């Protein structure tokens, strides 16, 4: 590592979780990038899972898939969308992965009879992850998951403390995000939680250089001075992380409160002002729209909308591109039946996202049937495409008991089946993952959307269309317009309906490649069709 040129920014959080550390880290990256610096962002997650791939979306939220096939925390999606820098498997690590690698090294004899301990062996592995391949970067922004004080976070905090000591203040800065709650009854902001959070962080040897406080309103000068005195942080480095209506307001908001300026001052770096015109343009468009598009999303994880974070953002990007306001009607697939189709009366389009398991399948099928019969724009993603095939096989091709072996292993017509190479005893890491090529049929709607014959999209699935049913379904009007290669045994990646204005299913996850500045063409077309 070129210690003279690479600076490390560590972002920690206190008081409560879900304050927006990932968005703060992404905003810092975007602001430094707007000044011309080369950056990367990394995430340390303290849970014992090797990755979030087998975790419930209701507990953890979305699993974000990188180009190289890593199943990662949803914050990596924020990193990519805010900066355009593609993340990799080297940008997210968990306690589980650290221990997994540690025990493999121990079994190989790499430690030569040493007593393997948290310090130095675990912390050394964490340090290696943070420092790996950073010598050509100006800044590495590293977010530490969880909350200061959690027992799971201790090895990670010790690791960044060590890096801060070894590289000195000239090359490291600690940014701590806390909560300053507003008590309605007292009509005042309370700083005590922030004081205790900084005290907790200081107890492990880390003195924050900047405090970001999450709040509805800014603190007064007197309140900032109080925190500065009690937390040993300059009052100019106590910066608000205010609630915003649109997350893409955050970089400009942080810049207006001098966050990037104070970071550069810490490192004694002179820099031109950031070019934030693209961020201003996005906000100007989103604030000026008057027309609304209504999209119905039918899913089973809607109790935690973070389960669909990239999907929501991709629809927002496409709506901004089409200069309309997005309104999402969330429908729980487990409570939807064929007698409630009036729920779709005021929607412009229907979307079925990815998912797992048979819970709520009938509700999704009801929505697909409605979209097909009423010529409403429909987009099915991953399982959404598979269910569209099952619905078509049953109701149009009249195949008896057409289903997926994921839902019924012994169905008569398994139009969706598990890929043979993925039939393993382990669930974790046992899917087709990451960016793969997809060959599009010339003259198809999907080709007209992408305007190219070969695309690359990210996948996350272990079930696929059974090619034995291809000819039969084609005879009834289902069109297969995208495949994984040009061979006869290629996986089906895209389907369309012959007699429908806009009905597309994709096996891949296009939402992972959308950004506010490069809205995904498939979502642009979907929103446009919703307006027609």
Swiss-Prot record:
Enzyme active site: 382, 509, 511
Binding site for CTP: 17, 150-152, 190-195, 226
Matching Gene3D superfamilies: 3.40.50.880, P-loop containing nucleotide triphosphate hydrolases (3.40.50.300)
Record GO cellular component, one term: cytosol
One Gene Ontology MF term: CTP synthase activity
Binding sites annotated in the UniProt record for UTP: 17, 190-195, 226
Any one GO BP annotation for this protein: pyrimidine nucleobase biosynthetic process
Catalytic reaction(s) noted: UTP + L-glutamine + ATP + H2O = CTP + L-glutamate + ADP + phosphate + 2 H(+); L-glutamine + H2O = L-glutamate + NH4(+); UTP + NH4(+) + ATP = CTP + ADP + phosphate + 2 H(+)
Ranges that cross the membrane: none
SUPFAM superfamilies in the record: Class I glutamine amidotransferase-like, P-loop containing nucleoside triphosphate hydrolases
Region described as Amidoligase domain: spans on this chain: 1-269
Domain Glutamine amidotransferase type-1, first and last residues per copy: 294-532
Enzyme Commission number: 6.3.4.2
Notes on how activity is controlled: Allosterically activated by GTP, when glutamine is the substrate; GTP has no effect on the reaction when ammonia is the substrate. The allosteric effector GTP functions by stabilizing the protein conformation that binds the tetrahedral intermediate(s) formed during glutamine hydrolysis. Inhibited by the product CTP, via allosteric rather than competitive inhibition.
Pathway given in the UniProt record: Pyrimidine metabolism; CTP biosynthesis via de novo pathway; CTP from UDP: step 2/2
InterPro entries registered for this protein in UniProt: Class_I_gatase-like (IPR029062), CTP_synthase (IPR004468), CTP_synthase_N (IPR017456), GATASE (IPR017926), GATase1_CTP_Synthase (IPR033828), P-loop_NTPase (IPR027417)
Keywords from the UniProt entry: ATP-binding, Glutamine amidotransferase, Ligase, Magnesium, Metal-binding, Nucleotide-binding, Pyrimidine biosynthesis
Chain residues that bind ATP: 18-23, 75
Task performed by this protein: Catalyzes the ATP-dependent amination of UTP to CTP with either L-glutamine or ammonia as the source of nitrogen. Regulates intracellular CTP levels through interactions with the four ribonucleotide triphosphates.
Matching PANTHER family: CTP SYNTHASE (PTHR11550), CTP SYNTHASE-RELATED (PTHR11550:SF0)
Comment field (misc): CTPSs have evolved a hybrid strategy for distinguishing between UTP and CTP. The overlapping regions of the product feedback inhibitory and substrate sites recognize a common feature in both compounds, the triphosphate moiety. To differentiate isosteric substrate and product pyrimidine rings, an additional pocket far from the expected kinase/ligase catalytic site, specifically recognizes the cytosine and ribose portions of the product inhibitor.
Family: Belongs to the CTP synthase family.
Record's subunit section: Homotetramer.
Protein name as it appears in the record: CTP synthase
